[in-house]
Amino acid sequence: MVSLTTLKAIKLTPGLVARFLVLPIHKVKNPCIYCPGICLASCPTFVNTGNMVLSPLGYARFPNLAREKCLKCWLCVYECPVEFPLPDTFNKEPVVLEEVSYKPGGIILVADQDIDVELASILSDKLGTGLLVIRGIKNRYIHGGPIDEKSVKKIKKRLAKAELALAVSPETAHTLNINPLILKLPALGVKVSYAGPVHIPCLLRKYKDELLDALEKLGVALTSINEECVKLSMKKDVLYLCPEAKNRGGKVVYDLLLSSMSTH
């Protein structure tokens, strides 16, 4: 684990940002190579190991290593003053999204075939919503790479027919830039019973305040917030919001939701 001394040394200051921003960013393919490490303290693999190679600075220089070791959590992008999408550079071949199946509805749940299709199918039936299942998203968060924009437009065109499109997984919400289902659950009139720590997914960090508000309305009594990446660490006493955590043996909010709905 990286030392606190190192983390304190990597501090974002106005001067540091100013020096970075005067670089001809628009002329370089990867500004991370010229960056002094503004985002390092946000990188889980760097914080966990203290190894500079296993950080955005290393991943920017060694894409083959990045495809294997980077968690594709996008936290570095959120910290970057120019929001450079480093994980998109790890593969040159764009990730193409494909429609697998479609069930119409006023509200459409969107799921990935390889992440959360079984869970989404059950939720769709229980909540009485439509369901769009696509393929391709999971690969983006395993190996990295840009999204094929033409395929995204096709998916968005399909979703435009619905009143509301909601992503079951953080990966889908992030890729398609649509709201995560958890934000709208209170409006659907469902409740859960839980008191304890809650995990905020890396890819949903921008929704943090909204997520906490939605969870409170759902009936969650929050005692603390966990923000460790599920690809590095899982805890038995934490409630997770992402289906990926369920695949890793974690307690997921959707399990509580389905259990609650089955008793009513």
Please describe what each predicted stretch is:
Residues V2-G15, L21-K29, L86-H264:
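Iron-sulfur cluster-binding electron-transfer modules in prokaryotic oxidoreductases
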Residues I33-L65, K69-V95:
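Iron-sulfur cluster-binding cysteine motifs and their immediate structural context
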